[in-house]
Amino acid sequence: AIKRLAGPAIGKAYRSRAIYATAVAQAAAGRLKEAAESLDNLLKLDVADDIDSEVRELTHLARGRVYYELGNIDASIDAYQEIGVRSKYFDQMLFEITWAYVKRAEEQETQADREAEYRKAIRAVEILLVSDPRSPIAPDAKVLLGNLHLRMKNYQIAVKTFESVVEAFEP
């Protein structure tokens, strides 16, 4: 599939889609560095239409994921932050960037630095829940928020957060 997508038959109109599909195939094959390079190259192309614009947003999400898997958390966060508030992927980005902040928190040496990253993670989840409370990922985001409050030793807030999840799913 990767060879076919890179072939000369791919016209300019489909170039961004082909590069994106190639990067996804590379990532699925475990070739994360190649995928990152393909995604980075994709951002050098001009956006010609609405489809290219959506591919661009998907590219930012994919870059965030690939760089996260490569352990380059700063690059992951930078990629996620390219997604705008009006994007239909905004809630997904906030959920994923939260995990990047958690990962960065776990890499910190001091408790103060860990807490600073956890606060960023909490803020991202809170923005997600306020901006789109009906998002399909809102229940998972609430559970994540509860866990973040546990890590910050905000036990009462964590309990209330978990209770709100239970109440939402009670028959």
Describe each model-derived feature in a short phrase.
Residues A1-P171:
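Acidic, polar-rich low-complexity tracts and alpha-helical solenoid repeat scaffolds
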